[in-house]
Curated annotation (Swiss-Prot):
This is Orotate phosphoribosyltransferase. Homodimer. Pathway: Pyrimidine metabolism; UMP biosynthesis via de novo pathway; UMP from orotate: step 1/2. HAMAP family: PyrE (MF_01208). Pfam families: Pribosyltran. Its EC number is 2.4.2.10. The keyword Magnesium applies. GO terms for molecular function: magnesium ion binding; orotate phosphoribosyltransferase activity. Belongs to the purine/pyrimidine phosphoribosyltransferase family. PyrE subfamily. Orotate binds at T118, R146. GO terms for biological process: 'de novo' UMP biosynthetic process; pyrimidine nucleobase biosynthetic process. It comes from Chlorobaculum parvum (strain DSM 263 / NCIMB 8327) (Chlorobium vibrioforme subsp. thiosulfatophilum). 5-phospho-alpha-D-ribose 1-diphosphate binds at E114, D115, V116, I117, T118, T119, G120, G121, S122. Its cofactor is Mg(2+).
Length: 193
């Protein structure tokens, strides 16, 4: 699947938004990828996650883990297509943790799956949890990489849609300087304001 084919799925499902957004990373942008809107359609979910699963099929993956909340749907479907255990990490009091009775054994080869990577912060936190369990991070995957490959998180890393989408530190944001209202649609928007 090409970048343009993936982008067409986002556009046709209304998942690529234009405006003034506060991203989960805290940075600001004029574009927002609302993956949930494209992933709500089973044919898109299956196709997108099938591409990710195919990329890692021969990598010995035994577990897929995703950061909550955005990565859960993608991670679950990738895990289903790979036929492996699928879990997620979530924040408790601001810290990413493996909870809900989930566990990782030191022998596991773990694929970290996220919906959108901007700075990679959530993925890094999940990777730290995997390493703390003594397991191996065998790869990182995402549906969208907003850095167009500039954010390098693992030796084996794959993103279906690679685009360089400009983002700004809040104090440097030209959209803020223009006085445009900001929207914070990300999964941490309520917790971070």
């Amino acid at each position: 699947m090409t970048n343009s084919e993936t982008l067409a799925m986002f556009k046709s499902s209304g998942a690529l938004l234009d405006g003034h957004f506060k991203l989960t990373s805290g940075r600001h942008s004029n574009s927002y990828f609302q993956c949930a809107k494209v992933l709500q359609y089973p044919e898109y979910l299956s196709a997108i996650c099938g591409e990710i699963a195919a990329h890692f099929r021969d990598s010995g993956i035994t577990t897929v883990i995703s950061p909550a909340i955005g990565g859960i749907v993608v991670g679950t479907e990738v895990g289903r297509q790979l036929g492996v255990k699928t879990i997620f990490a979530e924040r408790k009091e601001g810290t990413m943790m493996i909870r809900r009775g989930f566990s990782i054994d030191p022998s596991e080869q773990v694929l970290v799956v996220e919906d959108v990577i901007t700075t990679g912060g959530s993925v890094v936190e999940v990777m730290e949890q995997v390493k703390a369990a003594g397991a191996t991070v065998a790869g990182v995957a995402s549906v969208v990489d907003r850095s167009n490959g500039k954010v390098k998180l693992a030796d084996k890393q794959f993103s279906l849609l690679m685009m360089e989408v400009v983002s700004y530190a809040p104090e440097e944001c030209p959209l803020c300087k223009e006085g445009l209202p900001i929207d914070a649609p990300g999964s941490r928007s309520n917790a971070q304001g």
